[in-house]
Curated annotation (Swiss-Prot):
UniProt name for this protein: Leghemoglobin 2
Family named by the database record: Belongs to the plant globin family.
Gene3D superfamilies per the UniProt record, alphabetical: Globins
Gene that produces this protein: GLB2
Domain of life: Eukaryota
Subunit structure: Monomer.
Organism: Sesbania rostrata
PROSITE patterns in the record: GLOBIN, PLANT_GLOBIN
GO cellular component labels: cytosol; nucleus
Length: 148
């Protein structure tokens, strides 16, 4: 069964919850990443020279919004066509340049889900989590393909 209209709606609703507190949720997202993979700090220009995760950093917030937005867009693509195609072909080369490996995708996925769970609060469910996981997996597969 393909990605459903309901799954897309769940992703869209929780994405809006995430954006309601973009500064706080961005810090939370990168805190979760660094908690699991401290060495990943050097992969992000806005983190590599900072102590911990900087508060109110426009670059950090823009990158978090881009990551979550790409996953949300992937949900829309999966619903419409059943496949994720990168709108920005340079995503593969950027990830190669930064030294991103398969385990990094797992860390980011876990951080994304934990952040969304915090943002969504009582509306979070296994169904919401599953919708985001499917969309994220579609996006990560497209990025990995572009990396090879």
């Amino acid at each position: 069964m393909g990605f459903t209209e309901k799954q897309e709606a769940l992703v869209n609703a929780s994405y809006e919850a995430f954006k309601q507190n973009l500064p706080g949720n961005s810090v939370l997202f990168y805190s979760f990443i660094l908690e699991k993979a401290p060495a990943a700090k050097g992969m992000f220009s806005f983190l590599k020279d900072s102590d911990g995760v900087p508060q109110n950093n426009p670059s950090l917030q823009a990158h978090a919004e881009k990551v979550f937005g790409l996953v949300r867009d992937s949900a829309a693509q999966l619903r419409a066509t059943g496949v994720v195609v990168l709108a920005d072909a340079s995503l593969g080369s950027v990830h190669v340049q930064k030294g991103v490996l398969d385990p990094h995708f797992v860390v980011v996925k876990e951080a994304l889900l934990k952040t969304l769970k915090e943002a969504a609060g009582a509306t979070w469910s296994d169904e919401v989590s599953n919708a985001w996981e499917v969309a994220y997996d579609g996006l990560s597969a497209a990025i990995k393909k572009a990396m090879s």
